[in-house]
Swiss-Prot record:
It comes from Streptococcus pneumoniae serotype 19F (strain G54). SUPFAM superfamilies: Metallo-hydrolase/oxidoreductase. The lineage of its organism: Bacteria, Bacillati, Bacillota, Bacilli, Lactobacillales. Homodimer. Binds 2 Zn(2+) ions. Signal peptide: none annotated. Zinc phosphodiesterase, which displays some tRNA 3'-processing endonuclease activity. Probably involved in tRNA maturation, by removing a 3'-trailer from precursor tRNA. GO terms for molecular function: 3'-tRNA processing endoribonuclease activity; zinc ion binding. Its EC number is 3.1.26.11. This is Ribonuclease Z. It is an enzyme of class 3 (hydrolase). The keyword NADP does not apply. The active site is at 67 (proton acceptor).
Length: 309
């Protein structure tokens, strides 16, 4: 499980950073890629990665500002031109209005897609659990921005315990089909009468990962709730230390506020995202250094960077 950042800039593209988009790569888990936001130029960034557009099965939009959605029509159209690859349907989750935006863009441009898009729109009254599969659950909660905006909490369901092969061999169980039966929870009786209780040879289930991906927001309790015990918290950092007032006026956060959210939520790792173009390389180091005085395990991400979860 990895996150690859396709755009880490704020507001408009710059030479160093494209606008908002990231890919949650779940290839080992479910052979899918989930996109979160799709700003202008996202498909260009994807061309610089190993991501295959057909593997993108779901797109989650945080809000309808242009720097988070203007790349959708282009990506959806390009996804249709995957030669020699089977076309697969796509699901888009986002605030009310995302369906109208996509369908209008496709209609006026005369674009016809050879696959179906299933839209899942929500408003302030229809948040909470928005998706559940056999391996993942996704929650959405409203943040505090200048327009309706949400954050997402992706929870991997607990993983099966592992089989203690060494202990089984010591108990006289021959390697082979019997191992598989025990792994599936089946109790056995060996030829010599030894009873093998499957539960004695399988470790406890392992907790799944928690990934929190926030849209644009002021510091808010909703961010903390979404990030409780998160393995990774992706939080915007449009402004730096000392800019709390201007950040609030524009519906954004500082690096220090993001660090405070990570502390209050008990998150394990903080990734600062949505970086303003006014920050030069030396300022990026300061963003991290300042935030680390509050939350030590912090990192400022850059375009095309891949982070293992």
């Amino acid at each position: 499980m990895d996150i690859q950042f396709l755009g880490t800039g704020a507001g408009q593209p710059s030479k160093a950073r494209n606008v908002s988009s990231l890919a949650l790569k779940l290839l080992d888990e479910i052979n899918e890629v989930w996109l979160f936001d799709c700003g202008e130029g996202t498909q260009n960034r994807i061309l610089e990665t190993t991501i295959r557009p057909r593997k993108v099965s779901k797109i989650f939009i945080t809000h309808l500002h242009g720097d988070h959605i203007f790349g959708l029509p282009g990506f959806l159209s390009s996804r249709a031109f995957q030669a020699n690859e089977e076309q697969t349907d796509l699901e888009i989750y986002g605030p009310q209005g995302i369906k109208s935006f996509v369908l209008t863009s496709l209609r006026v441009s005369g674009s016809r897609l050879p696959y179906r898009i299933h839209f899942h729109e929500f408003d302030q009254d229809s948040l909470g659990k928005i998706l559940e599969t056999d391996k993942f659950t996704v929650y959405a909660e409203e943040l505090d921005h200048t327009i309706f905006c949400v954050g997402y909490r992706v929870m991997q369901k607990d993983l099966e315990g592992t089989l203690d092969a060494k202990k089984l061999k010591a108990a006289g169980v021959p390697f082979g089909p019997l191992f598989g039966k025990i792994k599936n929870g089946q109790d056995l009786v060996l030829e010599d009468g030894t009873e093998i209780k499957a539960a004695d040879y399988i470790s406890a289930p392992r907790p799944g990962k928690i990934i929190t991906i926030l849209g644009d927001t002021r510091k808010t309790d909703a961010s903390v709730r979404l990030a409780v015990n998160a393995d990774v918290l992706v939080h915007e950092s449009t402004y730096g230390k000392g800019d709390e007032k201007i950040a609030r006026n524009h519906g954004h956060s500082t690096n220090m506020q993001a660090a405070q959210v990570a502390v209050e939520a008990g998150a394990k790792r903080l990734l600062l995202n949505h970086i303003s173009a006014r920050f030069l390389s030396k300022d990026i180091s300061k963003l991290k250094k300042d935030a680390a005085t509050i939350f030590e395990n912090v990192h400022v991400v850059k375009d095309l960077e891949e982070v293992e979860i």
